[in-house]
Amino acid sequence: MAKLTKRARLIREKVEATKSYDINEAVALLKELATAKFVESVDVAVNLGVDPRKSDQNVRGATVLPHGTGREVRVAVFTQGANADAAKEAGAELVGMDELAAQVKAGEMNFDVVIASPDAMRVVGQLGQILGPRGLMPNPKTGTVTPNVAEAVKNAKAGQVRYRNDKNGIIHTTIGKVDFEPVQLKENLDALLGALIKAKPAAAKGVFVKKVSISTTMGAGVAVDQSTLNPTA
């Protein structure tokens, strides 16, 4: 039997696999167990009561976290004219149309988020096979295809997270960094859960938010007692 690492032993000692922790206790555990040599992200997994095989029960969208994610986000915007000027003013690193598409085709993708105005989708549509597998394809449901590109850029820079349930009906995203204050992580999680509840499909029946777990980049998941959370709309 393989030897457990020091961190794995610590996790096994500290985290009860069958217990749901008060959010403050869960965050304290994550901070105690975060021993990596870099500032780890705090990730969340939310098990939803949906049937992901049915298109009318899939959950997808985006929300701005009140305290951001702690990440520097580089934004590329496909647009032109006055919208291009507005996107640059809002802080977008890359703005253009055909010339920006050529960069993407050449493999130059130094960005984390792609936004497009509706008139630019004729150009962006040609990049689906490149952007799609990377989760970068703009979509109206996540607010990344919009006539108001400046607002979309500001949202991305302010810590907007995009979410989409996987084939098991689970949402995976980040709610900050392990060096955030506990109250910041709680408020970010509350905001995310509020957005998910608001996005509940009409076809979804029964308990919608079934389980919430938080973890650090290198750590194990800690189940959170939902009664200690306060989802915000």
UniProtKB/Swiss-Prot annotation:
<comment type="subunit">
    <text>Part of the 50S ribosomal subunit.</text>
</comment>
<keyword id="KW-0678">Repressor</keyword>
<dbReference type="InterPro" id="IPR028364">
    <property type="entry name" value="Ribosomal_uL1/biogenesis"/>
</dbReference>
<comment type="similarity">
    <text>Belongs to the universal ribosomal protein uL1 family.</text>
</comment>
<protein>
    <recommendedName>
        <fullName>Large ribosomal subunit protein uL1</fullName>
    </recommendedName>
</protein>
<dbReference type="GO" id="GO:0022625">
    <property type="term" value="C:cytosolic large ribosomal subunit"/>
</dbReference>
<dbReference type="GO" id="GO:0019843">
    <property type="term" value="F:rRNA binding"/>
</dbReference>
<dbReference type="InterPro" id="IPR016095">
    <property type="entry name" value="Ribosomal_uL1_3-a/b-sand"/>
</dbReference>
<dbReference type="InterPro" id="IPR002143">
    <property type="entry name" value="Ribosomal_uL1"/>
</dbReference>
<keyword id="KW-0810">Translation regulation</keyword>
<comment type="function">
    <text>Protein L1 is also a translational repressor protein, it controls the translation of the L11 operon by binding to its mRNA.</text>
</comment>
<keyword id="KW-0699">rRNA-binding</keyword>
<comment type="function">
    <text>Binds directly to 23S rRNA. The L1 stalk is quite mobile in the ribosome, and is involved in E site tRNA release.</text>
</comment>
<keyword id="KW-0689">Ribosomal protein</keyword>
<dbReference type="InterPro" id="IPR005878">
    <property type="entry name" value="Ribosom_uL1_bac-type"/>
</dbReference>
<keyword id="KW-0687">Ribonucleoprotein</keyword>
<dbReference type="InterPro" id="IPR023674">
    <property type="entry name" value="Ribosomal_uL1-like"/>
</dbReference>
<dbReference type="GO" id="GO:0003735">
    <property type="term" value="F:structural constituent of ribosome"/>
</dbReference>
<dbReference type="GO" id="GO:0000049">
    <property type="term" value="F:tRNA binding"/>
</dbReference>
<dbReference type="InterPro" id="IPR023673">
    <property type="entry name" value="Ribosomal_uL1_CS"/>
</dbReference>
<dbReference type="GO" id="GO:0006412">
    <property type="term" value="P:translation"/>
</dbReference>
<dbReference type="GO" id="GO:0006417">
    <property type="term" value="P:regulation of translation"/>
</dbReference>
<keyword id="KW-0694">RNA-binding</keyword>
<keyword id="KW-0820">tRNA-binding</keyword>
<dbReference type="Pfam" id="PF00687">
    <property type="entry name" value="Ribosomal_L1"/>
</dbReference>
